[in-house]
């Protein structure tokens, strides 16, 4: 047992941790990464030991701000460290690593210990990896989904018909929700949209919307905003909706994986938590996204529909083209600009963005009774073209605490590099993967001003020296790294009509 004085450390390690001087660990049974119980007069919290020679002095224990708040420990207060019991879920994680099926108790225990921070990031990574490699059956996924939802807040609505649109993501520039949600809300459809931050893409819906307004809303704020406007665009993590999901996402993000069991559970847990009774799931299909072909897409769609039936949620899925970025803007600020431009002047907006936003909104307009079957997309266009969607979008921004902006008022990264066409020819490929990696290298999504603006899309003719795309960053160093990466991976490929000359057999 160790008795040490608490010292505040302004650091976020993504898990509960305590930082102990090497001298205090010598001759004890405590080692780095050991799990300990930190006790004070006000309570206790579990954390993992990290050792240091300089960050804290002998006799001190560095504690992260979240831990201090959890147990109301004051700086300088003496705390007691003792070995904590191994989490109950460790053998269950090993069981899944061996490819075995988990029972409901085992799944619920894993999720509960994720939320209570009893699992370290290493242990959580092992669980995520096990589901990525070995998968889960539908009973396991259903149980995991329900438990993820139950660990957080649950929102209920007075109206019986509450709908939602959700994309599984993977497509750079996938900003359709900033058009579809205000279209639906303007038609009187109740659609409380909560989104994750980016996992595998350079910007999630919440990241883009955060450029324009506050997205960290509490339950009562969401209810008030939806009652006033019919819709919202909020970050699910701000509402304490399915908190286990956000913890899992933080482990998935560094390695850019989104295991299908977690994907299904993440999407549907948020629907349970927000009281959604009907949802349309967008499944982008194409090179460089999560789903490579229509057969895979149809298989995933059937899983969503089956899971929805087990959870009493009506699910309809649509397969959409995901072979290149949606629109021309990739990155939070650039996407926010493009969305507002599309709301202001839809006739001159990228056709891919308009078509996707209208198609998805049209389905829910028909479901909600605002349009006859087969007439939803037409009504969606009328709402968009008339300016009603822009008006509703600005109302949502205002109600969420922001101030509506003109596109040109949204700041972009001050460090800019234009990438030009090396030859005359045609754009034959735009790699989603390469675009995503370059934009992330430029700093997105954390740097909201970072991104790429495409000048041309697949099939467009270009001449040598034409600008193919522009990279933006808020950091000169990050821009240099992004440009160097772009020159290695060629996100936009230009080829002439002559592919290869062959003169010998």
Swiss-Prot record:
This enzyme's EC code(s): 2.4.2.57
Reactions performed catalytically: AMP + phosphate = alpha-D-ribose 1,5-bisphosphate + adenine; CMP + phosphate = cytosine + alpha-D-ribose 1,5-bisphosphate; UMP + phosphate = alpha-D-ribose 1,5-bisphosphate + uracil
Binding residues annotated for AMP, in chain numbering: 170, 196-201, 205, 266, 290
UniProt cross-references to Gene3D superfamilies, sorted A to Z: 1.20.970.50, 2.40.40.20, Nucleoside phosphorylase/phosphoribosyltransferase catalytic domain (3.40.1030.10), Pyrimidine nucleoside phosphorylase-like, C-terminal domain (3.90.1170.30)
GO CC annotation: cytosol
Catalytic residues as annotated in Swiss-Prot or TrEMBL: 258
Keyword Glycosyltransferase: yes
Domain of life: Archaea
Molecular-function GO term, any one: AMP binding
GO BP terms in the entry: AMP catabolic process; pyrimidine deoxyribonucleoside metabolic process; pyrimidine nucleobase metabolic process
Key words of the record: Glycosyltransferase, Transferase
Family according to the record: Belongs to the thymidine/pyrimidine-nucleoside phosphorylase family. Type 2 subfamily.
PANTHER family according to UniProt: THYMIDINE PHOSPHORYLASE (PTHR10515:SF0)
Annotated function: Catalyzes the conversion of AMP and phosphate to adenine and ribose 1,5-bisphosphate (R15P). Exhibits phosphorylase activity toward CMP and UMP in addition to AMP. Functions in an archaeal AMP degradation pathway, together with R15P isomerase and RubisCO.
UniProt protein name: AMP phosphorylase
Species of the source: Methanococcus maripaludis (strain C6 / ATCC BAA-1332)
């Amino acid at each position: 047992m160790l008795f040490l004085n608490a010292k505040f450390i302004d650091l976020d390690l993504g898990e509960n941790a305590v930082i102990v001087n090497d001298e205090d660990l010598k001759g004890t049974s405590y080692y780095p990464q050991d799990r300990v119980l930190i006790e004070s007069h006000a309570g206790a919290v579990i954390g993992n030991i990290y050792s240091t020679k300089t960050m804290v002095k002998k006799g001190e224990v560095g504690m992260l701000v979240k831990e201090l708040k959890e147990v109301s420990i004051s700086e300088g207060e003496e705390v007691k460290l003792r070995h904590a019991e191994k989490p109950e879920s460790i053998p269950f994680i090993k069981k899944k690593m061996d490819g075995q099926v988990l029972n409901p108790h085992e799944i619920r225990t894993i999720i509960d210990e994720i939320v209570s921070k009893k699992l370290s990031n290493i242990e959580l990574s092992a669980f995520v990896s096990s589901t990525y490699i070995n998968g889960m059956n539908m009973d396991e996924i259903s149980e995991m989904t329900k438990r993820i939802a139950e660990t957080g807040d649950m929102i209920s609505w007075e109206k019986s018909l509450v709908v939602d649109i959700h994309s599984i993501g993977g497509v750079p520039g996938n900003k359709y929700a900033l058009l579809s949600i205000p279209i639906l809300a303007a038609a009187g459809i109740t659609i409380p949209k909560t989104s994750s931050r980016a996992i595998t893409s350079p910007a999630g819906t919440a990241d883009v919307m955060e450029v324009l307004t506050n997205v960290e809303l509490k339950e009562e704020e969401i209810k008030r905003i939806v009652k006033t406007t019919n819709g919202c665009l909020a970050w699910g993590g701000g509402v304490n909706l399915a908190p286990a999901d956000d913890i899992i996402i933080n482990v998935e993000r560094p390695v850019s994986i989104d295991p299908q069991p977690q994907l299904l559970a993440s999407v549907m847990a948020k629907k349970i938590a927000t009281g959604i009774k009907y949802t349309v799931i967008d499944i982008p299909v194409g090179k460089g996204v999560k789903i490579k072909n229509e057969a895979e897409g149809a298989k995933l769609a059937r899983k969503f529909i089956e899971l929805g039936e087990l959870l009493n949620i009506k699910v309809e899925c649509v397969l959409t083209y995901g072979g290149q970025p949606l629109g021309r803007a990739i990155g939070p600020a650039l996407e926010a600009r493009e969305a507002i431009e599309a709301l202001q002047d839809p006739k001159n907006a990228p056709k891919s963005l308009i078509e996707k936003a209208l198609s998805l909104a049209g389905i829910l307009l028909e479901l909600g009774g605002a349009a006859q079957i087969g007439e939803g997309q037409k009504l969606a266009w009328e709402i968009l073209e008339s300016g009603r969607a822009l008006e509703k979008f600005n109302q949502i921004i205002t109600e969420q605490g922001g101030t509506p902006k003109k596109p040109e008022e949204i700041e972009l990264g001050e460090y800019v590099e234009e990438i030009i066409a090396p030859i005359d020819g045609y754009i034959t490929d735009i790699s989603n993967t390469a675009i995503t990696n370059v934009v992330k290298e430029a700093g997105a999504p954390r740097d909201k001003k970072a991104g790429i603006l495409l000048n041309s899309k697949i099939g467009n003719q270009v001449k040598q020296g034409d600008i193919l795309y522009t990279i933006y960053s808020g950091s000169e160093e990050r821009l240099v790294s992004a440009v160097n990466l772009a020159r290695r991976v060629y996100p936009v490929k230009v080829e002439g009509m002559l592919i290869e000359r062959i003169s010998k057999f």
